[in-house]
Amino acid sequence: MDRKNDGLRLMDGAGYKKIIIACDSYKGCLTSREVNEAIASGLKEWNAEDASPEKKNLHSEDASPEIITLEMSDGGEGMLDAFLSAMKGELVRIHAHDALMRWIEAEYGIVDDTAIIEIAQTAGLALIEPEQRNPMKATSWGVGEMIMNAYRRGVRRFIVGLGGSATSDCGIGMLKAMGDDWKKIRRECSFVLASDVTNPLCGENGAAYIFAPQKGADAKMVQMLDDRARKFAEVSAKHFGYDRSEAPGAGAAGGLGYAFLQYFNAEARPGAELLLDEVGFDALIQNADLVITGEGHSDKQTLMGKLPQRILEHVLKCRESDKSHVACSQLAGDCKS
């Protein structure tokens, strides 16, 4: 791969026919869609300014490049919008309960036979006022309500984004909301979890010790939550004859990951990778000239499986297998080494 020539080609823009923009949200600033649209708008303006015979930067012959924008998410903020935008699904609005059992309006998506659920729609930390946050009281009941609503509509496959939860109840609230129907759901449905969290359920690296303080827990609460999680896992293991509490991702979303893994035999996958696969990203970039990605804050964590890194891996794989010359560029709101 001639990376030097790629750099020159990226700077002069010559011959671009197809550009794909796939950025994550710039958290607290811009959504994925807003970032993508801003970049696309800038490219179009640059293209228009340089359309004279003497200055043809993005033009190939006399045609403007095709610009495709893809909303992206790592399984947390924006996952629902990303799936529905890329796959043209249906948005469903229901009344459900938040983590403090207050009635709210929640949304999930249906794409073909698959429900796209963000647990933060009901169990989200952002829905709870800072002074009200208490993981000893917060429940995942509303997640169960969303799943039951989709199940009654005939959905049997679920993609569940586990980011942004206010809860540490190990999914007990979700299971209670399902009632005895959880057994039918276990038999009939499949679940894929979108999460980059690999922590186990219990212990110093578990859900309570690592994540509960961010949700309002003090040191005493953390110990109590960890004890409660351990006891729940012991009871569940005796019932099923196996234990998933140590599985990677069991500690995600206050133990909701564990409930899905233990009770529904869910498959856990990195959120960004799951989305890229579901939208057919590899096929989209096969004849592209440039892929632009990015996130709000870029540092060493970016190289540990964050969206820009995964997109770069897909681009390099495409180059190696198809011998194409697609270039990849990252834009970040803030960079640290």
Describe each PLM feature range.
Residues 7, 11-54, 60-337:
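N-terminal loops that bind phosphate or other acidic moieties
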Residues 3-5:
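Acidic, proline/glycine-enriched N-terminal capping motif
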